[in-house]
């Protein structure tokens, strides 16, 4: 078994690590950096750039430089958060055929999974160059609050990159593994993870090598990108006030602003004032314009204060779900580059009543945790048990479209729970079990994961049959849902992967289409099947006529040609029955042609057998190699 690597696939930066004996090690990329920008660009000559080379040319190539694609992964195009992103990025976000949000470059569309896969490929190559061997297995981290579709899309990205994803683990859990691996002291910790695009908070109990997640919460659309955009908008507004020019209309200027905003944000974590200097940012009739501005830490903190405050409520919810007070948390571990910001550290200190722990590298700790988990799966790391939780409730749709929870959020996995339901109508002989994930009270407001039918329920008054629905989630997050009629013992089940399986978009489309057009779907499918069969028969018959038409009677040949013409005419329409009838007619008519072909084949085989009888035997003498070379 080759090495299993751990990858932190981040919104802004990605990182790869591997177990070196008993120690996790972060691997430097080809540019000598320990983290790689999660940026993919397409150059004029069609070359694909990933990481630092892509970031370097972003200013001159804004429309073909894709960044922060993790914010789109597993999301629908009409999602309000995607709508918000469309206003902020210089590249084009397009609507895919299945309704998902994709990106466009050079007239070609890419799914967020594909773009993420290019970054994962870079991580894979980085690890292979370091290890000197092929790598095809990985543990990849995701925000704890990612839903099923987002986890599946991340797994798909791994597959596209040529990696078998052995496990998807939550970023705060990975950070806790890295933090607590060498700690002998038991305790309760909170992991506060504010990254480039997402925010997570998890409460864990650590002791004797057991890492047990008690609760998790977060916001999958809150991170460093939002802080950058606040500053970009402020700079654009100030410039417009001074010069009367809106820089947002100039994609090249917008990209320069973004780069300057990110640099200023980083500098203000260690200094109280910075200067933004962008010469020749734009021009008008009077000549070139320059942007020069001093920015204080206080001003920046005022601009982003509400974003920092948005992290407080998820922390409170996580504490409440864990049944703990802030005072009962022994240590707060900071993860993600944004936690270097003094204002963030101040808010964390106020909330938990203690100085946060800064002993881990916030950019690398998640990848290190992923490598440790890879080591556990590989058997290199002993005596470590990771007990994670399901971040969102799982349940089914019941009468009136209500979402009935069977497994609550923050339940430790693996787990198995059952509940008994009944029929809604008299003499109902089948029930449809629709499986959902989420926290809303109505099923339609949550994410659908799949559906299946339990048939053959004996006729009985409504409310009498007893149908037991069981949810079973294993340590991989794989969900099995079964429904059993207690009277007959009949059982039906569906297997859904909480970090795999069908994507939400595909299922949603299938379910909605099937509900609205069940009969139409059947008719359309039959027509397509009939057309395919007919097309194939027309093609093979015409080919056979060309090759063997001379071997049959003229009247038989004409009958076949007429049947072909009739079927071609029928194929112009969508009447499945007419196409089937004409297909049968052609099949019958062309039987004579088939007979002629088989007859010819039989004659050819007989001739071959006769020829074999005339084969002359010959003797061969083996020549020794040594003699040959002598």
Swiss-Prot record:
Any one GO molecular-function label of the UniProt entry: ATP binding
Name of protein: Chaperone protein DnaK
Organism superkingdom: Bacteria
Chain positions found as Phosphothreonine: 198
PROSITE patterns: HSP70_1, HSP70_2, HSP70_3
Chaperone recorded as keyword: yes
Lineage: Bacteria, Pseudomonadati, Pseudomonadota, Alphaproteobacteria, Hyphomicrobiales
Similarity section: Belongs to the heat shock protein 70 family.
UniProt cross-references to InterPro entries, sorted A to Z: ATPase_NBD, Chaperone_DnaK, Heat_shock_70_CS, HSP70_C_sf, HSP70_peptide-bd_sf, Hsp_70_fam
Gene3D superfamilies tied to this protein: 1.20.1270.10, 3.30.420.40, Actin, Chain A, domain 4, Substrate Binding Domain Of DNAk, Chain A, domain 1
Disulfide-bond pairs as recorded: none
Ranges of Basic and acidic residues composition bias in the record: 516-529, 540-558
Keyword list, A-Z: ATP-binding, Chaperone, Nucleotide-binding, Phosphoprotein, Stress response
Regulation: induction: By stress conditions e.g. heat shock.
């Amino acid at each position: 078994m080759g090495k299993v690597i751990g990858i932190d696939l981040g919104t802004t930066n990605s990182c790869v690590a591997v177990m070196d004996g008993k120690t996790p090690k972060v691997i430097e990329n080809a540019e000598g950096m320990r983290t790689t920008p999660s940026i993919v660009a397409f150059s004029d000559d069609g070359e694909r750039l990933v990481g630092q080379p892509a970031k370097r040319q972003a200013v001159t190539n804004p429309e073909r430089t894709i960044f922060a694609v993790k914010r789109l992964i597993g999301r629908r195009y009409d999602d309000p958060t995607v709508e918000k992103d469309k206003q902020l990025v210089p590249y084009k976000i397009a609507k895919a055929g299945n309704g998902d949000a994709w990106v466009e470059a050079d007239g070609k569309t890419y799914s967020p999974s594909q773009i993420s896969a290019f970054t994962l490929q870079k991580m894979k190559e980085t690890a292979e160059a370091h290890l000197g061997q092929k790598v095809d297995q990985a543990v990849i981290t995701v925000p704890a609050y990612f839903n099923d579709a987002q986890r599946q899309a991340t797994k798909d990205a791994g597959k596209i990159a040529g990696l078998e994803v052995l496990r998807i683990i939550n970023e705060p859990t990975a950070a806790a593994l890295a933090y607590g691996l060498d700690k002998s002291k038991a305790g309760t910790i909170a992991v506060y993870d504010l990254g480039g695009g997402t925010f997570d908070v998890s409460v864990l109990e650590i002791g004797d090598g057991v890492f047990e997640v008690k609760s998790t919460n977060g916001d999958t659309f809150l991170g460093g990108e939002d802080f950058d955009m606040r500053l970009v908008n402020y700079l654009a507004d100030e410039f417009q006030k001074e010069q009367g020019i809106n820089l947002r209309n100039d994609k090249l200027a917008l990209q320069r602003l973004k780069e300057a905003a990110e640099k200023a944000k980083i500098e203000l974590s260690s200094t109280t004032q910075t200067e933004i200097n962008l010469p020749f940012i734009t021009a008008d009739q009077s000549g070139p314009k320059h942007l020069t501005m001093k920015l204080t830490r206080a001003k920046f903190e005022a601009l982003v204060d509400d974003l920092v405050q948005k992290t407080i409520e998820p922390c409170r919810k996580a504490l409440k779900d864990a049944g703990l007070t802030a005072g009962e948390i022994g240590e707060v571990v900071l993860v993600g580059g944004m936690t270097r910001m003094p204002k963030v550290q101040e808010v964390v200190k106020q909330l938990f009543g203690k100085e946060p722990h800064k002993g881990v590298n916030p950019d690398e700790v998640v990848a290190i945790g992923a490598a440790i988990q890879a080591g556990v799966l590989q058997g290199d790391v002993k005596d470590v048990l990771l007990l994670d939780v399901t971040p969102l409730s799982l349940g089914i749709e019941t009468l009136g479209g209500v979402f009935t929870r069977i497994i609550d959020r923050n339940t430790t996995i693996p787990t198995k729970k059952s509940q008994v339901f009944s029929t809604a109508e008299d003499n109902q002989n089948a029930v449809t079990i629709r499986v959902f994930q989420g926290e809303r009270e109505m099923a339609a407001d949550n994410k659908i994961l799949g559906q299946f039918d339990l048939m053959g329920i004996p006729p009985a008054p409504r409310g009498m049959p007893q149908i037991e629905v069981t949810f079973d989630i294993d340590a991989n997050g794989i969900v099995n849902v079964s429904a059993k009629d207690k009277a007959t013992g009949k059982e039906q089940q569906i297997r859904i992967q909480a970090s795999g399986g069908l994507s939400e978009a595909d299922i949603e489309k299938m379910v909605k289409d099937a509900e609205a057009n069940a009969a139409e779907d059947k008719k359309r499918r039959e027509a397509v099947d009939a057309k395919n069969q007919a097309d194939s028969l027309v093609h093979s018959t015409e080919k056979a006529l060309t090759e063997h038409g001379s071997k049959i009677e003229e009247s038989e040949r004409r009958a076949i040609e007429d049947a072909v013409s009739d079927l071609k005419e029928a194929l112009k329409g969508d009447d499945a029955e007419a196409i089937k009838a004409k297909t049968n007619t052609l099949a019958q008519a062309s039987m004579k042609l088939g007979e002629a072909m088989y007859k010819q084949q039989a004659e050819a085989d007989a001739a071959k057998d006769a020829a074999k009888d005339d084969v002359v035997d010959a003797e061969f003498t083996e020549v020794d190699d040594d003699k040959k070379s002598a």
